């Protein structure tokens, strides 16, 4: 059975890697952020289409069984500007809907931040879901936490999955796995990383483990407003797209609360406080060590890793979709 799919807002390709592991074949990828192009092409072996999604013509996209993608989430996030579809980045979601309508794949998957189903954005989110229903899809959505699917990270995201109506299928989200993966499991064997060079430039190939370097610099008052350390036997905090907000490595003690929204580093900590390295973040997101991230400034490395869908979670969703499709098409 043909398992060719198209990827949008591809980034480094965490969603793509998970779907590939489940037996799908990425034949088209699109992202207009140049910071991810080399990383995607080197690791996935296909050329990326570099246009903004609004400029894409349906004729440029091959016929595929499915569409996958996570439209930019800053416009829907609780930490961001909360302007939703009024933000140009929010409008890209509707460009995705239009392409699904034109190409009519058997299924689509979209991922976004949980802020999209917050009270502020819920009416807009329901309009978005209805726009998929109106073009002939049975749509299901759910907030999933990656830690329930073998990912060593607290990370809640909304997943929307639609099956074309003529398949008579309803997507049921996979049940959580009875398997907790900890920070120790994910990063405990890594050697000491290197700090980034001046102005957070990358060490490039002068690293024992690729991308095993961390952002230096001060910690903002926002960063110090809560504890940023999880212990070895816990899962990580959410890996964010900004290196400045990368969690601290578990070698240090948990931070101490000294007032409302004010924490300090424990002066008694046996080891220093530092941000997780790009490779540590990548491991937490499920990328193997032979998946190399290419960047000149470590900030771009953190952005690629933090924007990705955790590979293991993507794979679990993909396996369920593949099983459903095989059930009706074979």
From Swiss-Prot:
Coiled coil: none annotated. GO terms for molecular function: DNA (cytosine-5-)-methyltransferase activity; DNA binding. It comes from the Archaea. InterPro entries: C5-Methyltransferase (IPR050390), C5_MeTfrase (IPR001525), C5_meth_CS (IPR031303), SAM-dependent_MTases_sf (IPR029063). The keyword Lyase does not apply. The active site is at 73. Keywords: DNA-binding, Methyltransferase, Plasmid, Restriction system, S-adenosyl-L-methionine, Transferase. Its EC number is 2.1.1.37. Transmembrane segments: none annotated. NCBIfam families: dcm. PANTHER family: CYTOSINE-SPECIFIC METHYLTRANSFERASE, DNA (CYTOSINE-5)-METHYLTRANSFERASE 1. Belongs to the class I-like SAM-binding methyltransferase superfamily. C5-methyltransferase family. This is Type II methyltransferase M.MthTI.
